[in-house]
Amino acid sequence: MILTLIAASVLSGCGTTVPVKSAGNEADVVSQLVVARAQARWDALRKRDMDVAYQFISPAGRSLMSAEAYRPRVNSQFWRGATAKEAICAAETCEVTVMVDMLLEGVKFTTPVKETWILDAGKWWFVYQG
């Protein structure tokens, strides 16, 4: 039941869909859902759609920072792409590893970024630490 609520809640957010293993355990399903949300957030960041990216921030984070305050804090000029690779989850927290492709002074490289996501009111949210 809880898994169904989590899946329905996450899949309804920002048009995100993700394949779910029919025989997978609950941890695998939650991990897939969180990775999909993290990818959707990075897709919005890459498109410089800060209003969409802002909506992935936890309700507590959004209560402390407006969308107007968030927009100038994000500098995506060096990003060339990002792939959410995995989520390691425990209870109501996940650590997501995102591989970010960058171009800085003519040098291309990929660097891992660790993000924290939390479960709040049945939905997974990004914890903004900027």
Predicted segments, located by residue:
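Sec-dependent bacterial lipoprotein signal peptides
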Residues: 1-14
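Surface-exposed, charged secondary-structure patches
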Residues: 71-114
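Short beta-strand edge/turn micro-motifs at domain boundaries
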Residues: 109-130
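Short, hydrophobic secondary-structure boundary micro-motifs
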Residues: 53-55, 82, 127-128
